[in-house]
């Protein structure tokens, strides 16, 4: 059974390496930060991803990841160490011996700082293939190098030195480098090491304060709602009390009319009794009594109608009052809803 070979990505081109070094220079405060916490680690990982995006934007056809560009930088730094060592060995062999301590210092100087390389006057760039020498066996993301003509203008030494000088950090340009573009997403990076450690609990305290403030507002709204509900129940209670009073008043009026009716009936019965002794006098009196009774009946009916009219007017007034209260409760309900939506936003 044939073993399938995994297709490996091509080597980094000159343009990709140049872009990689430039982007590392822009983000050196983040990538080479000595602080160790979760926030800094996330920021470093995002910085490498952004560098990979910038390298991919060159358009060489390969899609690099943050891990690949980081590994490419480590290879590049190892290459710089080897070339610096060779250059120092040449100096020693040409009659300029260096003490062992000075040799070690020269090998490590500036390598582990910021970017890890600098534009050294005693270092001679022989070929632009140095951009690709860091590939080889040190990385897993590269394949055989592309064949290029070293005599082409693209690989002129002067142009290469100019490109290198554009990506090598310089003390005069360090203050002009742009800040890490997404640093605001993970708080402001300060030169004081204890600043980020202070910001995290401070941010948590602010979040807790905001949560408590929102909870307090919610409780205030709930208290207002309960107060409105209490007022509504009080109004409903008053309305029922008025209805009970009206019912009792009507019941008393009904009993009074019943008594008046009994009284009139007794008067009629008494007026109809014949009197043999006073037939003439009683005849005249009996003619007047039916008229008086009819007048009383009309008067009582008029009073009853007036009472009924007053009752209807009172009920109308109660109806209008309840309608006004209903509208007030609706307005209060809308106000609480708008206030609640404002807090949620």
UniProtKB/Swiss-Prot annotation:
Residues 143-175 are annotated as: Disordered. It comes from the Eukaryota. Residues 4-77 form the Myb-like domain. Keywords: Coiled coil, Isopeptide bond, Phosphoprotein, Ubl conjugation. Pfam families: Myb_DNA-bind_5. There is a cross-link at residues 9, 114, 142, 237, 254, 273 (Glycyl lysine isopeptide (Lys-Gly) (interchain with G-Cter in SUMO2)). The modification Phosphoserine is found at residue 106. The modification Phosphothreonine is found at residue 188. Residues 203-345 form a coiled coil. One of its GO terms (cellular component) is nucleus. PANTHER family: MYB/SANT-LIKE DNA-BINDING DOMAIN-CONTAINING PROTEIN 4, MYB_SANT-LIKE DNA-BINDING DOMAIN-CONTAINING PROTEIN 4. This is Myb/SANT-like DNA-binding domain-containing protein 4.
């Amino acid at each position: 059974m044939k073993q399938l070979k995994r297709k490996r990505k091509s080597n980094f081109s000159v343009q990709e390496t140049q872009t990689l070094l430039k982007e590392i220079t822009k983000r050196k405060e983040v990538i080479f930060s000595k602080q160790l916490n979760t926030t800094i680690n996330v920021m470093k990982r995002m910085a490498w991803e952004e560098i990979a995006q910038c390298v991919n934007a060159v358009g060489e056809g390969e899609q690099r990841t943050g891990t690949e560009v980081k590994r490419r930088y480590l290879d590049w730094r190892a290459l710089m160490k080897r070339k610096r060592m060779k250059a120092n060995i040449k100096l020693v062999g040409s009659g300029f011996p260096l003490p062992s301590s000075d040799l070690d210092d020269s090998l490590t100087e500036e390598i582990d700082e910021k970017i890890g390389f600098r534009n050294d006057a005693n270092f001679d760039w022989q070929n632009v293939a140095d951009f690709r020498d860091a590939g080889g066996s040190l990385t897993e993301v590269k394949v055989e190098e592309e064949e290029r003509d070293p005599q082409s203008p693209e690989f002129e030494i002067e142009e290469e030195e100019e490109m290198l000088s554009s990506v090598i950090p310089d003390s005069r340009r360090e203050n002009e480098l742009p800040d890490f573009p997404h640093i605001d997403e993970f708080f402001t990076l300060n030169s004081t090491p204890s600043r980020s450690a202070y910001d995290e609990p401070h941010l948590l305290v602010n979040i807790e304060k905001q949560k408590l403030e929102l909870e307090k507002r919610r409780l205030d709204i709930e208290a207002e709602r309960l107060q409105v509900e209490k007022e509504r129940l009080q109004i409903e209670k008053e309305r029922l009390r008025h209805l009970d009073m009206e019912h009792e008043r009507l019941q008393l009026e009904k009993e009074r009319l019943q008594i008046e009716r009994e009284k009139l009936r007794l008067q009629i019965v008494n007026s109809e009794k014949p009197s043999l002794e006073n037939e003439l006098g009683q005849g005249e009196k009996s003619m007047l009594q039916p008229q008086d009774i009819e007048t009383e009946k009309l008067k009582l009916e008029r009073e009853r109608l007036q009472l009924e009219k007053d009752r209807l007017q009172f009920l109308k007034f109660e109806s209008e009052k309840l309608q006004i209260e209903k509208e007030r409760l609706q307005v209060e309900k809308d106000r609480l809803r708008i206030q609640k939506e404002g807090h949620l936003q």
